[in-house]
Amino acid sequence: MEGTWAPWTYHDEDDNLVGYDVEVAQQIAEKLGVKATFVEGEWDGLLAGIDSGRYDIMVNGVDITEERAEKYSFSDPYAYNRTAVIVNSANDEIQSMEDLDGKSTANTISSTYAEVAEKYGAAVTGVDDLEQTFELLLSGRIDATLNAEVTYYDYMKAHPDAEIKIACLDPESTKVGIPMKKGDETK
């Protein structure tokens, strides 16, 4: 888990790891009769942890893509995301996915959001976490960022004066599942 991506996984005011994915993982562990052990890391290294056998599963808002499904077994979807293009409030240049062409964005490099941004012609700056992404956006160093619609609303709840907005939503929802090594029967 990243521990930096509210409302999925983040730290509360007492520095406890909390969020929707933490609750999902705890429920899975309870059903399996095991204790959940949470290991935090940067997004770009989490799937590699499954490859190396360091982690059994990754519960961190992982979109089920064709490419990932070729490499990992996935649980049934447990959530659906809509990708939001988030911009500064004054930005009226970006109003559709196609308007990302030639623009700058920031995301963790191996995320689905980075792939979508690149698909629409945006240049992606790699970041370590969500806070870094919003810092770049608010400072005007990038034109936009792509993320889950729910993540935007959660950020605005915590930062109601942030001068950002959703410019548009990708019309297609993504399915969120739990990846594990191919052939793992805990599915």
Where are these regions (language model features)?
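Short loop->beta-strand "edge-of-pocket" segments that line small-molecule binding or catalytic clefts
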Residues: 1-2, 97-110, 123
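Extracytoplasmic small-molecule ligand-binding "clamshell" domains
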Residues: 1-61
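Short helix-initiation/N-cap motifs at beta->coil->alpha
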Residues: 20-23, 37-48, 92, 110-111, ...
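Alpha-to-beta junction loops
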Residues: 33-35, 51-60, 103-104, 138-151
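A ligand-binding cleft/hinge motif common to bilobed small-molecule-binding domains
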Residues: 45-48, 62-70, 116-119, 143-172
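Short Pro/Gly-enriched coil loops immediately N-terminal to beta-strands
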Residues: 72-84, 167-175
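Flexible hinge/capping segments at coil-to-helix
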Residues: 75, 88-104
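A bilobed periplasmic-binding-protein/Venus flytrap-type ligand-binding module shared by bacterial periplasmic
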Residues: 84-93, 173-186
